């Protein structure tokens, strides 16, 4: 904690520092002082008076239900003026079909591919390749 002495205006309008003895300060700021970082009693009393007791907030099921019923995911709030409409990220499917795509994360195949490259073999795919026209349906 850094304590500064108050400034007093002199007759010429310049600022002058008052000595510590004139201010009634009796402790030092060195590390060996037992009062280092201590708060004077007058300040302590003032801090205690300024602190208000915490008010308890009682939450009931009815209050929570009311609160959650007023929440909205839509942009109909007063701070959204005018309402914004968002275009869909993907166009809607015209004729959806059930296709199955078999895919495996290649991260698990990287060590195997490196091992095969060191040996000089060509890696074989873990799944047999299907011709471009073949589609598996469910």
Curated annotation (Swiss-Prot):
Question: What InterPro entries does this protein's entry cite?
Answer: HCFC1R1
Describe tissue expression.
Widely expressed.
Taxonomically, which superkingdom? Answer: Eukaryota
Q: Principal place where this protein is found? A: cytoplasm
Query: What keywords would UniProt list here?
Result: Cytoplasm, Nucleus
Q: Where is this motif: Nuclear export signal?
A: 110-119
Where is the protein situated, by its record's location annotation? Cytoplasm; Nucleus
Looking at the keywords, is Iron present? no
An example of a Pfam family matching this protein is HPIP
Record-level GO cellular component terms:
cytoplasm; nucleoplasm
**DNA-binding in keyword set:** no
Annotated region Interaction with HCFC1: the residues are: 76-79
Q: What does this protein do?
A: Regulates HCFC1 activity by modulating its subcellular localization. Overexpression of HCFC1R1 leads to accumulation of HCFC1 in the cytoplasm. HCFC1R1-mediated export may provide the pool of cytoplasmic HCFC1 required for import of virion-derived VP16 into the nucleus.
* Record note on quaternary structure: Interacts with HCFC1.
Protein name (database record)? Host cell factor C1 regulator 1
């Amino acid at each position: 904690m850094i304590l500064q002495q108050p400034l007093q205006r002199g007759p010429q309008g310049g600022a002058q520092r008052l000595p510590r003895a004139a201010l009634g300060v009796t402790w030092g700021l060195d590390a060996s002082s037992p009062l280092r970082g201590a708060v004077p009693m007058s300040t302590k009393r003032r801090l205690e008076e300024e602190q208000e007791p915490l008010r308890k907030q009682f939450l009931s099921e009815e209050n929570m239900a009311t609160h959650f019923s007023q929440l909205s995911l839509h942009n109909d709030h007063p701070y959204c003026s005018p309402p914004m409409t968002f275009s869909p990220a993907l166009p809607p499917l015209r004729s959806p079909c059930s296709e199955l795509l078999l895919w495996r994360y290649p991260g698990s195949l990287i060590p195997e591919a490196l091992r095969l490259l060191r040996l000089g073999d060509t890696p074989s795919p873990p799944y047999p390749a299907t011709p471009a026209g073949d589609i598996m349906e469910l």
